[in-house]
Amino acid sequence: MENETFGTELPDTWVGRIDGDNPEHALWYTTVSPLPEPDEVEEGVVTLGFASDEGNLRNHGTAGAALGPDAIRGVLGLVAVHDARPRYDAGTIRVGGDLERGHDELSDAVETIARAGHLPIVLGGGHEAGFGSHRGIYRARGSSPAIINLDAHLDLRAAERPTNGTPFRQVRELVGEEFRYSVLGVSVPNNTDFLFNAAREFGTEVTTDDEINAMSPQEAADHALALVRDAEHIHLTVDIDVLSEALAPGTGSPAAVGVELGRIRAICTGLAATGRLTLVDVVEVNPRLDHNNQTARVAARLIHEIAEAHLKAT
């Protein structure tokens, strides 16, 4: 595993164009900065790559999500920026076959970023990122943030080794009774009774894809906000397979139905606008399965809107 975090140069997958030197020409590509010393710069948002296929492979899935962080950066760089708040990139953790070490590196990086007052935005990579990132914020904050998981799957599997299906069972084992977990967009046919029983045992709030799709975007956002109304801090984790395969084909476990994008956008920006986000993951983007970077573009749009709303609120 090659650690490429907290360097003095940006990853070379940040690409774009330069239309001019004035702020009115700003793009992510022209505004994002490397982050060698997180505690010596103005507070902002920090993208951090977690290039991991190992969780998918252990779960008998398809490789390719390790390419997700670079694919997301490649399209996020072209997105226009309409504020002067700082955006940083802390590099990429490249996992290889040692997921446990990857989790350690991710937890350490997230803790460092959060202690310096920034919002970490983890780019995946498999959803195994959710455990490593949450453990890092748990250490930084001294408590476990409420988790909102936008996902077709409950991710509460029991397994001998961590996979992309076990992250939130691992979080439950870590934080115990502090565990506060809500999953929105669940596909009932893609989760066994064992998983639903685990969700009930752990007090998980479950909202299905059909239930979210029956709401307006504003109702969906209000529903998510109600779940964390009294939470001081929020961990928003977005598995791109919460969306329909027609919109997000580049993922290892695509959804036949999925949640309509407008509702996911409303939930993400509604949560970000509270100013209480403490951690964000956007995961399971697999460029090998994508069409013309379609899924990476959707992920980049969500990341941009989350960052913009959070920076405006803080």
UniProtKB/Swiss-Prot annotation:
Signal peptide: none annotated. Its EC number is 3.5.3.8. Pathway: Amino-acid degradation; L-histidine degradation into L-glutamate; L-glutamate from N-formimidoyl-L-glutamate (hydrolase route): step 1/1. Keywords: Histidine metabolism, Hydrolase, Manganese, Metal-binding. It comes from the Bacteria. GO terms for molecular function: agmatinase activity; formimidoylglutamase activity; manganese ion binding. It catalyses: N-formimidoyl-L-glutamate + H2O = formamide + L-glutamate. Its cofactor is Mn(2+). Catalyzes the conversion of N-formimidoyl-L-glutamate to L-glutamate and formamide. This is Formimidoylglutamase. It comes from Corynebacterium efficiens (strain DSM 44549 / YS-314 / AJ 12310 / JCM 11189 / NBRC 100395).
